[in-house]
Regions:
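Generic beta-sheet signal
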Residues: 60-64, 91, 150-156
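Short acidic, glycine/serine/threonine-rich loops at helix termini
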Residues: 25, 75-77, 103-107, 139, ...
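A short alpha/beta connector and helix-capping loop motif
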Residues: 73-98, 153-155
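Acidic, glycine-rich active-site loops and adjacent beta-strand->loop/helix elements
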Residues: 16-19, 66-73, 97-101, 132-134, ...
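Glycine/aspartate-rich loop-and-adjacent alpha/beta segment that forms the canonical ThDP
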Residues: 134-204
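A glycine-rich helix N-cap at a beta->alpha junction
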Residues: 5-12, 83-96, 120-124
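Cofactor-binding active-site loop characterized by glycine-rich and histidine/acidic residues
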Residues: 1-85
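Conserved thiamine diphosphate
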Residues: 57-60, 107-140, 191-202
Length: 204
């Protein structure tokens, strides 16, 4: 939509030797500020931004979107410990918990459940919401804004591919490729959902 990637180049996604890989690389994509993904570096970087902002007196919040599979990485929990230690109440992590990752379901991986108590044990304020419910998400953001003395995590229980009939809850669409016909179908279904949404633009 913004012309950063030529439409034809999109067809090279996850093809050997191209710059559009499953884990984005900031070396090859200059508009991507850093390389994150399933190695779990994102929360550490977001914590650094939050720490720096507080020390400089900047009244900003740092947000980090994590995948459920990503939180199997030790790096995430090291950052979680540090964030609680430094009482980073300007840090908000959102975990997209859809139960599917990199070609497998979470059921075949070491269990992360019970999940919320883990974050709470690390000193975080933890909220769980149905992640495909826009109003529930906005209410959780609103709650997080009023938490003092600790970081907040929102665990959003989502359905992967929600709103696209052939993608919903299908592990193969973790990194699947669409044809022109499937793209048009997905765009049509998503646009219909967007038109049906109420106005959730105001957060007090």
């Amino acid at each position: 939509q913004r012309g950063l990637i030529p439409r034809e180049e999109l067809k090279t996604f996850e093809t050997l030797g191209t710059r559009l890989q499953g884990s984005v690389d900031s070396i090859w994509l200059p508009w991507v500020e850093l390389t994150t993904g399933s190695l779990g570096q994102g929360l550490s970087v977001s914590l650094g931004i939050a720490l720096g902002a507080k020390r400089l007196g900047n009244d900003i919040r740092s947000y980090c979107l994590l995948g459920d599979g990503e939180t199997q990485e030790g790096n995430v929990w090291e950052a979680a410990m540090a964030a609680a230690k430094f009482e980073q109440d300007n840090l908000l992590a959102i975990v997209d918990w859809n139960g599917l990752q990199g070609g497998v379901t979470l059921e075949v991986m070491p269990s992360m459940e019970p999940y919320l108590p883990k974050w709470e044990a690390f000193g975080w304020h933890a909220i769980e919401v149905p992640g495909n419910d826009v109003e529930a998400l906005l209410n959780a953001y609103h709650e997080a804004r009023h938490v003092k003395g600790k970081p907040t995590v929102i665990v959003a229980r989502t359905t992967k591919g929600k709103g696209v009939s052939y993608m919903e809850n299908k592990v193969e669409w973790h990194s699947g490729k669409v044809t022109d016909e499937l793209y048009e179908q997905a765009a049509s279904e998503i646009n219909a959902r967007l038109e049906a949404l109420s106005d959730y633009s105001v957060l007090k």
